[in-house]
A protein has these predicted regions:
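Short C-terminal tail/terminal secondary-structure segment
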Residues: 2-4, 108-111, 161, 244, ...
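Alpha-helical segment proximal to the catalytic Tyr-Lys
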Residues: 142, 185-189, 252
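Active-site helix of classical SDR
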Residues: 137, 172, 180
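C-terminal substrate-recognition "lid" of short-chain dehydrogenase/reductases
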Residues: 95-96, 134, 143-145, 232-261, ...
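Residue(s) in the substrate-gating loop at a strand-loop-helix junction
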Residues: 156
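Conserved glycine-rich cofactor-binding loop
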Residues: 32-34
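Substrate-binding pocket helix/loop in short-chain dehydrogenase/reductase
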Residues: 112-114, 118-126, 224
């Protein structure tokens, strides 16, 4: 029978700094609230230096307030034509390197079923959920190649199973997952890992800006919980934990994976 080798009695079980985010530089988009905020704080808790990117200065300042010596806010619209290069330049100027890119920023719009779409709405969804992560990742490649870094994209459970009445949102995330898998192969020779998380129903403010009214949001949340085997919504910090694990040096043989963080919704 095969047995795992026993640890030397002098081995220390605690994580070394090489196994954590200590002294690494992380860029997190959509860091003003929800998953992005908790991800920025989770990396800072491990000793990483974090550039927290978002559109609104006030929420970013609140994010940074938890670890003011480690999290620096940067107010920027990542869909702007010069934003990807500007974000990377800011990280390099402030910290001198870039090790991890978390493409978390995303938007959702109220139900736009067949016949209800317009060009402006489609382009807005794709600009934030797909085009910006691709261009930001592309801008970060030289720095990530130098550090043999990591890209973690934030998708969604409906990117894998579709969302009736919100097909374009689901499609934008499905496309991001395809980019994740494709880049994992393409960038492996450069030592860059690429992975994604696919959250299910998470208790975040993203729905507040979706155009859904309170009753619609409550109905959607009720449906989500009913279709989640664990019977509840997830917490932003639960997704943040998964993101930090994928970005960890301990996950050095993990690339191309899309990790579901959905309480079992995809398989249930």
């Amino acid at each position: 029978m095969n047995e795992f080798p026993k640890n030397d009695e002098n081995d220390e079980s605690d994580e070394s700094d090489e196994d954590t985010a200590k002294d690494r530089v992380v860029v997190v988009t959509g860091a003003g609230t929800g998953i992005g905020r908790e991800t920025a704080r989770a990396f800072a808790a491990e000793g990483a230096r974090v550039l927290a990117v978002g559109r609104r200065p006030e929420p970013l300042a609140e994010t940074a307030g938890a670890y003011p010596s480690l999290i620096e806010p940067l107010a920027a619209d990542i869909t702007g034509p010069e934003a990807p290069e500007a974000v990377v330049a800011a990280a390099l100027e402030r910290f001198g390197q870039l090790d991890v890119l978390i493409n978390n920023a995303g938007i959702v719009r109220s139900g736009q079923g067949v016949g209800g779409y317009d060009r402006t709405g489609i382009e807005a969804l794709l600009a934030t959920n797909l085009v910006a992560p691709v261009l930001l990742g592309q801008a970060a490649l030289p720095a990530l190649g130098d550090s043999r870094g990591v890209i973690v994209n934030v998708s969604t459970a409906v990117g894998q199973r579709g969302w009736p009445s919100n097909a374009v949102y689901a499609a934008s995330k499905a496309a991001l997952e395809t980019v994740t898998r494709s880049w994992a192969v393409e960038l492996a020779p450069r030592g860059i890992r690429v992975a994604a998380v696919a959250p299910g129903a998470i208790d975040t403010p993203i729905g507040d800006h979706s155009g859904y009214g309170p009753e619609q949001r409550a109905a959607v949340r009720k449906w989500q919980i009913e279709h989640t085997p664990l019977g509840r919504t997830g917490r932003p910090e639960e997704v943040a934990w998964a993101i930090t694990q994928l970005a960890s040096p301990r996950a050095s043989f993990v690339t191309g994976v899309v990790l579901s963080v959905d309480g079992g919704a995809l398989v249930g």
